[in-house]
Curated annotation (Swiss-Prot):
Any single GO BP term: DNA recombination
Name this polypeptide is given: Transposon Ty1-LR2 Gag-Pol polyprotein
Post-translational modification: Initially, virus-like particles (VLPs) are composed of the structural unprocessed proteins Gag and Gag-Pol, and also contain the host initiator methionine tRNA (tRNA(i)-Met) which serves as a primer for minus-strand DNA synthesis, and a dimer of genomic Ty RNA. Processing of the polyproteins occurs within the particle and proceeds by an ordered pathway, called maturation. First, the protease (PR) is released by autocatalytic cleavage of the Gag-Pol polyprotein yielding capsid protein p45 and a Pol-p154 precursor protein.
Chain residue ranges for the region called RNA-binding: 299-401
Integrase catalytic domain segment(s): 660-835
């Protein structure tokens, strides 16, 4: 007998359950399952492999085995336990037959088996015919195919083999459903093969390998009858059996035929879904392959539409073709043919054969329509890979497959192929898509690569040869190993920080370790299966476990998404820190130059060009390996983005048809750029460029004009240069048809020199593309250099020349060389180059005196043409010099202050680069060069003359250190000279002296008032100091330190021994000096400034009356005293305790300094929001500060504690830029999508409620006839811009009801589909508050109504279509809208016009002019907010009459009729209102805040105590730049948006006492420092502690004949950034607070009086509008009043002086106030500061004062 041949173990592959085996019985060519069973589902593979691993029983192990029944697995492999039957039910050959049936003529050796006890066992009946095999045992059961090469034993050995060998044969499962018949047939065929009946199975041509015997046919019939009950057979099988009940062979033949057909279709679908193309194969072959697949599928009934096909193709594009995925997917009607046109075009560009396939070239219009951009700013996408594939690459270089340098994937819209709204379908099995099923977008397997990582797990990767991890927390024995080279799947280098050990502690208490590499530049933590295999650990994906070879289970495997993962809990943590890991390459010899530094050094060229140039040695001094390229792929230079912004790139190869090949320097392109306006006369206004066609060498020459002689001089120079330097003669010069080229003078010159002029033809810009693109490139570089360096614009040509020098030295990927190499010149030595605008110090060899400084600050421009020196710009001398005597000025801060390049400080790199060039400061330099007098060869820049009429930004004069500057400060500043960060000025003023010519980081002028007269006991003193002097660095540091102390209580207090003058050091933007100024009262300041400006600040005489009220106008009908008392009587002003007489201290004694920082936003202002403070000033001292806010910041800081992670790239956020960038608060989404509310909602009860709401909404839509149900439209027939996307949104209302709404995606609606002039109006909050206040005073009934589905009552005029709701199942159809669906741009306006028309025509209402959505008639007032209506009426029947009329047309629900005389509770537009008619009204939001604030994840009551105030005075927001990584920054900004969004909503509803804090913190949403977050937490904490507070209104006295409308105003001078003031106003109607406003002044005020005028002028327009509204709603007379605590402001308003004001802006405001007072019956009165409740709107107050000003109107 032939010996058994057992296969060896194959390597364990990713996803395989065990080793694959091969027996001699398996046929390689004739097996009919080659096209079917070989692609069965994974469960079938697993069961087959598990079956092949079973061992023989001990009784039969010693018996020779039958070669046809060979067990291919060694006995050491345990049998699987996860089959459909228990282990004891596994059948031998005898067990596979019914009881009593003899096998091969031998009696059954097992009369009873557990299998026969199965409930699915079909016992044989008496009529059953069991096969009795012939007695000739030599007849084999199956005949091998000729190709198999198998031989069989003779008859004598066959009998012994059959009786001695028992092979376990797994029976097929029972058929339980007709739909499962295809899968069951496959298992049944496997059963026949394992039973040695493979030869009788029909092949692909429908014929078996051998003839079936009668016994075998009987066996076939009986087993088929047992395992396939007739009730579960499909119809076509029953049809066959009805003709011949024994024709099992025909059933098998038909089944195999269907398998073959399905397999081909499935293979095509899988191939189509996994297309990959990167240009490595011809585009024709790729197109043929794709079109053949699509044609086959279409012919077989599987329709692939154009959009799906294009999406599948685009998903597989990579390399240069990848951009098509982000540009072409937006074209809805794109075809496959159009997509392949783009692919062919790119392929031709790659191959350089632009004329090979002209039929694929697109015209220019196609290019424009495509909006194609070659600039790929997105980051590489992570490739979705089947984790079960094995990487067979044997490259010596370690490869980490599927590793990306970023977690961000390209973002696409809803139609993109990278997203899907349905569950992904894996197209890895042929039965995933059945015959006739259409392949739609939802069928394609999409993966969101930004969300596919399983946190806390390692990804198992069979393709990675090394293990990589991002966190250093688990790395043991870390060490530097720079020799390791790791690349990802795209062959990009991955920088490795360190190598170490990864130690595992598995669940069986065993420990092991493998090598691991540390890098933060990967998307996942990768665990290599190859390295696990090296330590005897394999992955079994059948059991989903990690196990040893002996079967010991170590850890479970989790399948998440497309990948398999292992938990990190089995990793042992190490004690190594992140800085330790990341500092392993800190040695000077191994540290590489950062790419951003090289990028700036080489004129901001792109990374591929720089890298190629270094590789080809066109740039010398260092190699490609000396540069850190890790950030080159994702690096975005802000200066390049600004300076080189463009639409799209040019068309490559567009000029080939216009010229032939020429030798170097024979064919030149030239063009002129200019003019550049607003430049000094000495600076050039034009430049002319020349480019050689062959070498691409460039020349640029400056021009002051475009005269003929100027152009001729340049042509003469360039021709002579080429002839003498390159021994070449120019033959052709290509140029445009400008007059400077077509003039007779130049034409004769060219003709004389034998040069052919080549002019462009009309409308043929492509022919002149070389010169024009060069000019554009140089101008891009110029803008970028000027932007980066900050140099003035008149140095623009120096930037052009610097760019030309660098670009001549960079290699072209096309020509493989640089222009200098083509010209035969040496490469550029980068060590001789400085970044453009690099600050340097130039030696002055001939100073004015011996004690004069020898160094002159300057800025490096470019290497000199005429010497070995460098062209340097000296601002103090206003000229450029050519010198070698300079030293690089170093600074620890980035010079690029406009953009923060992740802390780009290149001083050390620059020192290493220029180490071989010693400066004049070196001690070994004994001779001084006198070449400072050598003027630059650029005469146009030697002596800069500025136009006197040109406007300039004049810098503030530097103050001498002797002016009240402490000596220590000056000394410290002097020591920092070498580290000063000097930046060039944008413009140079000819009047600026040398002492102040150097630029500052921020160019802002400080408001100054000179010659301020100060009155003292000794007489008049004149001070020539700025009003706001800059603070010294030392004082700034002390102030910062003081503001950050743990005790936030202000420690400064006044004593009787201190004077009323304070030296206030105030930080000035960019300033380095400080001054001390006396603190002067408002009245004194205004009184002294009046000598220069007679009318702006005139102070009135002191009024020492008890009320301190100055009436401005006295009406004839009311006495002055009565009007004053009438206005103030009902106001909720605080009751002040009696004060003792004030003892004024000696004016010459100094008050303690108030530490402040002028440039910072603060919650405490400057000296409590005043630059000048005296005892008799309106600003209070801080001695009554009883601040109790002592919440430890440590409590807040524990919120965002992060685990040890590798450092990420930091993002610097500048305070002022962040504050200026805040336009509005981003709304936070509070609704749920369909998948969140229903599909994936795990809360069953809530899900059912949402489903109910969903059906209710659909029924309402149908009831309202929202769309046309008579006709459905094909999507291809409708203009895409008229198709509106739609979606369902769900939310839970405050009353607990669940609501669904079908809305349109108006945010992406095309502008042509709506009228932008239409307005969607809602009632203003002030109108609602006014109506509520009048309702209380007049005993009105308040009725609240709701109109269901209000928008759907409004018809839509435009032709718009939407996709049907999901439940209709018509994805390819469209329906036309008839009603205004929620979400459309025009829906709100349509509804407003509809309801407005109905209320006016049917209800007899009229809209109040100027107040939209406020309607009235003689009895009823209506406030309308979309579908909510609030009705106010003296007679409840009048309200009921309106309701009856509304119900005739609309589905109107009465929320609250308001008929009770007891307290009634309302919920009106978010306000929780308690109203008892004729008594009081309380407005609050307690229930809403109780629900919402805990959801903000803010730690509430960390100390178990309540806060008494929302903020505290004396605390300033630090202006230091914020360094934070990108993810954390976005997270904190999002958190700030949520917190400030809620606070703003509450503040503007009724908590007007919080508006100052809300407004200040809202300006810092984009600056989420720890300090800002702490202050925001305190604000939310205070809101939580006072959530039960209410705005209290009481009914006005019935005897009052008039309505009194009052605005109380206040301003805090200069307490905001850039000296802006905070202004605030509170509005009261009949003593009830109805609104408030706190904001930063739009203009910069120079005095407290100007700030107060600004505040009052801001309140007057709203005051007049409210007055008109009140008169329309209530016919009582109205008295308007303005209250302010500024006497000087009242004096200005009262004055009739017509002289000019000092400031025309505030003069205009003051004159307007005069007109308002004189013409609109407006009364202006003085109010004491301690009673001014508007004070809470402009500054933080001590707790005692805060409570005193607010407790009467909100409590």
């Amino acid at each position: 007998m032939e010996s058994q041949q057992l296969s060896q173990h194959s390597p364990i592959s990713h996803g395989s359950a065990c080793a694959s085996v091969t027996s001699k019985e398996v046929h390689t060519n004739q097996d009919p399952l080659d096209v079917s069973a070989s692609k069965t589902e994974e469960c079938e593979k697993a069961s087959t492999k598990a079956n092949s691993q079973q061992t023989t029983t001990p009784a039969s192990s010693a018996v020779p085995e039958n070669p046809h029944h060979a067990s291919p697995q060694p006995a050491s492999v345990p049998p699987p336990q996860n089959g459909p039957y228990p282990q004891q039910c596994m059948m031998t050959q005898n067990q596979a037959n019914p009881s009593g049936w003899s096998f091969y003529g031998h009696p059954s050796m097992i009369p009873y088996t557990p299998y026969q006890m199965s409930p699915m066992y079909f016992p044989p009946g008496p009529q059953s015919q069991f096969p009795q095999y012939p007695s000739s045992v030599g007849t084999p059961l199956s005949t091998p195919s000729p190709e198999s090469g198998n031989t069989f034993t003779d008859s004598s050995s066959a009998d012994s083999d059959m009786t001695s060998t028992k092979k376990y044969v797994r029976p097929p499962p029972m058929l339980t459903s007709p739909n499962d018949f295809p899968n069951w047939v496959k298992t049944y065929i496997k059963f026949l093969q394992n039973s040695n009946l493979g030869g009788i199975i029909p092949t692909v041509n429908g014929k078996p390998v051998r003839q079936i015997t009668d016994d075998e046919l009987t066996f076939l019939y009986n087993t088929f009858q047992i395992f396939a009950p007739s009730q579960f057979l499909p119809t076509w099988v029953k049809d066959i059996l009805s003709v011949d009940y024994t024709d099992i062979m025909k059933i098998l033949s038909k089944s195999i035929e269907k398998m073959q057909s399905d397999t081909q279709e499935a293979n095509d679908i899988v191939t189509l879904a996994n297309l990959q193309y990167n240009g490595s194969t011809p585009a024709d072959a790729f197109e043929t392959k794709v079109t053949n697949i699509i044609d086959r599928l279409n012919n077989n009934g599987i329709h692939i539409n154009n959009k799906v096909a294009c999406q599948l193709i685009m998903r597989g594009l990579s390399g240069e073709y990848k951009f098509l995925r982000y540009t072409r997917h937006r074209h809805l009607n794109m075809t496959v043919a159009e997509l392949f046109l783009d692919i062919h075009a790119i392929y031709e560009e790659q191959q350089g054969s632009r004329n090979s396939k002209p039929n694929y070239r697109r015209n220019l219009s196609d290019e424009k329509n495509d909006s194609r951009s070659y600039t790929n700013t997105t980051k590489p996408k992570v490739i979705a890979r089947n984790p079960q594939k094995t990487n067979n690459s044997k490259s010596k270089t370690a490869r980490a497959h599927n590793v990306s340098t970023s977690n961000n994937s390209p973002s696409t819209d809803n139609d993109s192929i990278s997203k899907s709204t349905t569950e992904p379908i894996q197209l890895n099995n042929k039965h995933d898509l059945h015959l006739g099923q259409e392949l739609t977008e939802s069928t394609v397997n999409h993966t969101n690569h930004s969300d596919d990582e399983l946190p806390g797990h390692l990804l198992l990767d069979s393709g990675a040869s090394r293990t990589l991890i991002r966190s250093a927390h688990h790395i043991h024995s870390a060490s530097s190993n720079p020799d390791i080279n790791v690349v990802d799947a795209q062959k990009r280098n991955i920088p490795i920080n360190a190598i170490g050990d990864l130690q595992f502690h598995f669940q069986d208490n065993t420990k092991t370790s493998i090598k691991v590499l540390h890098t933060p530049n990967i998307a996942y933590d990768l665990l290599s299966l190859n390295e696990l295999a090296a330590v005897d650990i394999t992955a079994c994906f059948t059991k989903n476990v990690l196990e040893r070879s002996d079967g010991t289970v170590l850890a479970p495997i989790v399948k998440y998404g497309d990948f398999y993962w292992v938990s990190k809990k089995y990793l042992l943590p190490s004690n190594i820190s992140v800085p330790t890991i990341n500092n392993v390459h800190t040695s000077e010899s191994t540290r590489k130059y950062p790419y951003p530094f090289i990028h700036r050094m080489l004129a901001h060229a792109n990374a591929p060009t720089i890298r190629y140039s270094l590789k080809n040695n066109t740039i010398t001094y260092f190699n490609e390996s000396d540069v850190d390229w890790s950030s080159a792929i994702d690096y975005q230079c802000p200066d390049c983005l600004i300076g080189k912004s463009t639409k799209h790139r040019h068309i490559k190869g567009s000029r080939l048809k216009y010229q032939n090949s020429y030798e170097p320097f024979q064919y030149l392109h030239t063009d002129i750029f200019g003019p550049v306006h607003n430049l000094p006369n000495s600076a050039p206004s034009y430049f002319i460029s020349f480019t050689d066609e062959t070498t691409k060498f460039r020349w640029v020459y400056p021009l002051h004009d475009r005269r003929e002689d100027s152009i001729l001089d340049v042509f003469t120079t360039i021709l002579a240069f080429i002839k003498n330097q390159f021994q070449a003669s120019v033959l052709v010069i290509q140029m445009d048809r400008g007059s400077e080229y077509t003039n007779r003078t130049l034409h004769k010159f060219l003709e004389k020199n034998g040069i052919t002029p080549c002019y462009t033809t009309t409308a043929d810009s492509r022919a002149h593309g070389v010169a024009e693109r060069l000019n554009r490139t140089l101008l891009d570089d110029c803008r970028t250099q000027l932007q980066c360096s900050g140099l003035p614009n008149h140095l623009w040509f120096s930037a052009i020349e610097f760019s030309t020098i660098v670009r001549n030295s960079l290699a072209s990927p096309k020509s493989k060389k640089s222009a200098r190499q083509h010209a035969g010149l040496a490469g550029l030595d980068i060590s001789t180059l400085l970044p453009f605008g690099q600050p340097v110090i130039v030696n002055d060899h001939n100073p004015n005196s011996k004690i004069h400084p020898r160094g002159i600050p300057g800025y490096a421009l470019h290497p000199s043409r005429n010497s070995y020196g460098y062209i340097i710009y000296l601002p103090s001398l206003k000229k450029t010099v050519d010198t070698t005597n300079y030293v690089i000025l170093q600074g620890k801060e980035s010079r690029l202050d406009q953009f923060n390049y992740d802390a780009l400080t290149f001083d050390e790199d620059l020192n290493r680069l220029t180490a071989s060039y010693h400066s004049f400061i070196a001690s070994n330099e004994i001779q001084e060069s006198n070449d400072l007098n050598i003027e630059s060869d650029h005469d146009f820049q030697s002596d800069i003359e500025l136009h006197p009429e040109q406007p300039r930004n004049v810098l503030s004069k530097a103050v001498s250190p002797t002016d009240s500057t402490p000596p220590s400060t000056h000394t410290e500043d002097s020591k920092r000279v070498s580290k000063t960060n000097i930046r060039a000025p944008r413009e140079v003023d000819p009047n600026i002296s040398e002492s102040n010519i150097l630029p500052s980081k921020k160019r802002s002028s400080t408001p100054q008032i000179s010659n301020i007269e100060s009155t003292g006991s000794g007489g008049m003193h004149k001070l020539n100091v700025p009003l706001l002097a800059p603070m010294s660095q030392s004082n700034t540091h002390e102030s910062s330190h003081a503001s950050k102390s743990k005790d936030f209580r202000h420690s400064d207090s006044y004593s009787e021994n201190e004077t009323n003058h304070t030296n206030v050091p105030i930080s000035s933007t960019g300033g380095t000096n400080n001054k001390t100024v006396p603190q002067i009262s408002d009245q004194e300041t205004e009184k002294r400034i009046i000598h220069r400006s007679p009318s702006i600040d005139a102070s009135p005489p002191e009024n020492n009356s008890s009320h301190n009220i100055v009436p401005i106008k006295t009406p004839t009908t009311v006495s002055e005293q009565n009007t004053e008392e009438s206005i103030i009587a009902d106001l909720p002003l605080p009751d002040l305790p009696p004060e003792s007489p004030t003892e004024f201290p000696d004016p010459f004694k100094e008050l303690p300094p108030i530490n402040s920082r002028q440039t910072n936003s603060s919650l405490g202002g400057i000296g409590d929001s005043n630059a000048y403070t005296t005892i008799n000033s309106k600003k209070r001292s801080l001695e009554d500060n009883e601040t109790e806010i002592k919440v430890s910041r440590d409590t807040w800081n524990t919120k965002n504690m992060r685990s040890l992670e590798p450092p990420r790239s930091k993002k610097r956020i500048h305070l002022i830029a962040a504050v200026k960038a805040v336009k509005s608060i981003k709304p936070i989404r509070t609704t749920l999508r369909y998948d969140e509310a229903i599909t994936y909602n795990k809360d069953i009860k809530e899900k059912e409620k949402y489903i109910e709401a969903y059906h209710k909404e659909v029924n309402q839509l149908l009831k309202m006839k929202t769309w046309d149900t008579d006709e459905y439209y094909d999507r291809k027939e409708i203009d895409p811009k008229r198709v509106i996307n739609s979606m369902f949104i769900f939310n839970k209302k405050r009353d607990g009801t669940h609501k669904a709404r079908f809305v349109a995606r108006g945010d992406i609606q095309h502008p042509d589909t709506y009228d932008s002039g239409m307005q969607s109006n809602t009632v203003h909050h002030y109108a609602l508050m006014t109506s509520l206040s009048l309702a209380l005073d007049n005993n009105y009934y308040i009725t609240q109504l709701d109109i269901s589905s209000a928008y759907l009552y409004a018809d839509i005029k435009e032709e718009l279509y939407i996709r049907p709701p999901p439940h209709l199942g018509m994805n390819d159809k469209l329906i036309r809208l008839k009603k205004s669906l929620y979400g459309l741009k025009q829906s709100g306006a349509n509804w407003y016009e509809t309801i407005k028309s109905y209320l006016i025509k049917q209800c007899g209402m009229e809209e109040v002019r100027g107040w939209s959505c406020v309607f009235k008639n003689s009895q009823v007032t209506i406030c309308l907010f979309v579908d909510d209506m609030i009705l106010f009426s003296k007679d409840l029947n009048a309200n009921k009459k309106i309701i009856t009329t509304l119900k005739k047309q609309y589905d109107t629900k009465i929320i609250n009729l308001g008929e009770s005389d007891n307290e009634i509770q309302y919920d009106i537009l978010g306000l929780e209102i308690k109203y008892q008619r004729g008594k009081y009204m309380k407005l609050g939001m307690e229930n809403s805040l109780t629900e919402k604030i805990p959801k903000l994840n803010v730690p509430l009551n960390p100390k178990g105590r309540k806060l008494s105030a929302p903020g505290q005075p004396g605390l300033y927001i630090d202006q230091d730049e914020l360094e934070i990584d990108e993810d954390e920054y976005k997270e904190k900004v999002h958190e700030m948006q949520k917190l400030i969004g809620l606070a703003s909503y509450v503040g503007y509803k009724f908590r007007f006492d919080l508006l100052y804090y809300i407004n200040t913190l809202a300006q810092h949403i984009l600056f989420p420092s720890r300090q800002v977050l702490d202050m925001t937490y305190e604000l939310i904490q205070f809101m939580w502690d006072t959530r039960d507070k209410q705005l209290i209104w009481h009914k006005n006295k019935p005897t009052e004949p008039d309505n009194k409308l009052v605005a109380i105003s206040d301003a805090s001078y200069g307490n905001q950034p850039y000296y802006k003031s905070q202004i605030g106003n509170i509005y009261l109607l009949n003593g009830k607070v109805i609104g408030g406003k706190s904001t930063k002044a739009s203009l910069t005020c120079t005095s407290t009086t100007e700030a107060e005028i600004h505040a009052i002028s801001e309140s007057v327009p709203l005051l007049n509008n409210l007055s008109y509204l009140i008169q329309e709603l209530n016919k009582k007379p109205i008295i308007k009043g303005l209250l302010t605590d500024s006497r000087s402001t009242i004096s200005i308003i009262k004055s009739t002086n017509e002289e000019k004001f000092r400031n025309r802006f505030f003069g205009t405001k003051a004159m307007r106030l005069r007109d308002e007072v004189s013409g609109n019956n407006l009364y202006v009165y003085y109010i004491e500061t301690k009673k001014n409740i508007a004070d809470v709107m402009t500054k933080p107050l001590p707790i005692k004062t805060f409570k005193l000003l607010t407790n009467k109107w909100i409590h």
